[in-house]
Amino acid sequence: MIAANPTDLEVYLFHEGRLYQSYELFGAHVIRGGGAVGTRFCVWAPHAREVRLVGSFNDWNGTNSPLTKVNDEGVWTIVVPENLEGHLYKYEIITPDGRVLLKADPYAFYSELRPHTASIVYDLKGYEWNDSPWQRKKRRKRIYDQPMVIYELHFGSWKKKPDGRFYTYREMADELIPYVLERGFTHIELLPLVEHPLDRSWGYQGTGYYSVTSRYGTPHDFMYFVDRCHQAGLGVIIDWVPGHFCKDAHGLYMFDGAPTYEYANEKDRENYVWGTANFDLGKPEVRSFLISNALFWLEYYHVDGFRVDAVANMLYWPNNDRLYENPYAVEFLRQLNEAVFAYDPNVWMIAEDSTDWPRVTAPTYDGGLGFNYKWNMGWMNDMLKYMETPPHERKYAHNQVSFSLLYAYSENFILPFSHDEVVHGKKSLLNKMPGSYEEKFAQLRLLYGYMMAHPGKKLLFMGSEFAQFDEWKFAEELDWVLFDFELHRKMDEYVKQLIACYKRYKPFYELDHDPRGFEWIDVHNAEQSIFSFIRRGKKEGDVLVIVCNFTNQAYDDYKVSVPLLAPYREVLNSDAAEFGGSGHVNGKRLPAFSEPFHGKPYHVRMTIPPFGISILRPVQKRGERKQNEEEVHRHVIGRRARKPASLADEKHRETSRAVWGEVPDH
């Protein structure tokens, strides 16, 4: 139960930057006790001369509803002796120079539908969750050696009703979940759902950090959506923006007439690129606000993780000719990750960082930032640049494919083809591909196949699964009419089977963060733009051979070295006719020959598809398996397992072991 008045300990921890449930102190809370009921409001406004409560319950006249100042640091509170659930409200703040500001509650749990901006008293309690099996399953598995394919989407533009209205959170549970499950995705990632005034910002310029946007329903409706996802076996990750916020007059900006949540120095405060304000990450009260917010989404909405947006904008001071590290941001991110993993060691904390900042996913006690995953922006940019290169010129850009393996194990990576790559004139993924209509599809199938075979978890933005031709338009739904066209249907089928193949074979994901899981067979064939490599699982002898051809030239009887003396079966070929390809496949088992080639004792002769990927798997009899496992063991002996980055500092080492487990040396 919420106390009628803030406790001294709560207030102290808030001002120390260590009140991680500050949402229990601030905001609007219905309180009950002794047969009475009331509603407590609490707000932080350190520069205010006076604060009044206004709303639909007092005709927006705060004369008789002044808040009491709790301390000199600006905590104000009032208890209204009524149950005000469902009522609109704002804070009327009198600044030191006498100006009157009407502000929404920074800790509001629900807000009016835009363009209106009032906060709404809402009791979050009362929803009955049914996701206990999902939570138990999460605790049993280490996330690092599990398959992960994320479906990234914008809630308002995935699909719309015939009259153009949004689907609600509850309606989307029926529409979205079966679609995502049918294609085999393991998680969905939602562009920001905090309350935000402008649709065009996609949610990245928010101001109501504790208020799930009312565009699609109520907080309980969103709980229902997440609950349904978990019951279906889908994880839910949300985009979260702790670096900057919108400057609309009703929001956080100059909250009490002076810089409150933002930096005092204008050069540090103003984010001129996005037209927003940067959070003052050195201010303890702001840290309490933001870290509590992450824990709030975990506690009340059961989300499984966060993709932390624009980490580079936090790590470096903005608006400087040279890049200077922001020590407040570094300390904040470490404190954030420690707090999150102390709460739940199975959370996904994903950094969207475009810089080469070292050790983003390394332990905080060892100087790292403490995330457990990072988007691999370097791989994404190199691969898209390579694929946009005319095929006959790709031999001159060969290292754009191979370079990523030089740093693939420096962090725990996710390979993203995200919303950022299909907007602002960048073209859709399909339209980035050069060549004819059919060649565009072939190369996109190849690109997706290579992404699945490359070390790292995977992310694909909505519409890419059926090769949307146009860029993403936030105000329109996806081009579902494309399912009327054969190659788009076949692309969708290919993505289904590709993800199923990825999830079926453990070498694709078990050693994503261990160098033993990948080995080049031939990385030097620039002339033909052909790459071949091995992916390995934890079990000795569990291997896949992958061959990628980035030109339109097919090859027969092509020699590829293999690690085991066994026949090989092609488990997937992107050029299969069922996917819209030309049919250059390996329909029969491929025998391995005992002739050394490319540093291996064996090789096969196979068909290489044009603009295609072929995935081979050895077919072994039980008697052969032990012998082959011994050969593989001899080959990899001495290659050392890399322990994925742990996350806690010295005082959280026990939590760290719970997160990562023990990885033995080899």
From Swiss-Prot:
Family, similarity comment: Belongs to the glycosyl hydrolase 13 family. GlgB subfamily.
Pathway: Glycan biosynthesis; glycogen biosynthesis
Residue pairs linked by disulfide bridges in the UniProt entry: none
Thermal dependence, as annotated: Optimum temperature is about 39 degrees Celsius.
Ribosomal protein found in the keyword field: no
Taxon lineage: Bacteria, Bacillati, Bacillota, Bacilli, Bacillales
Protein name: 1,4-alpha-glucan branching enzyme GlgB
UniProt-listed Enzyme Commission number(s): 2.4.1.18
Catalytic activity: Transfers a segment of a (1->4)-alpha-D-glucan chain to a primary hydroxy group in a similar glucan chain
A GO molecular-function annotation: cation binding
One cellular component term from this protein's GO annotations in UniProt: cytosol
GO biological process, one term: glycogen biosynthetic process
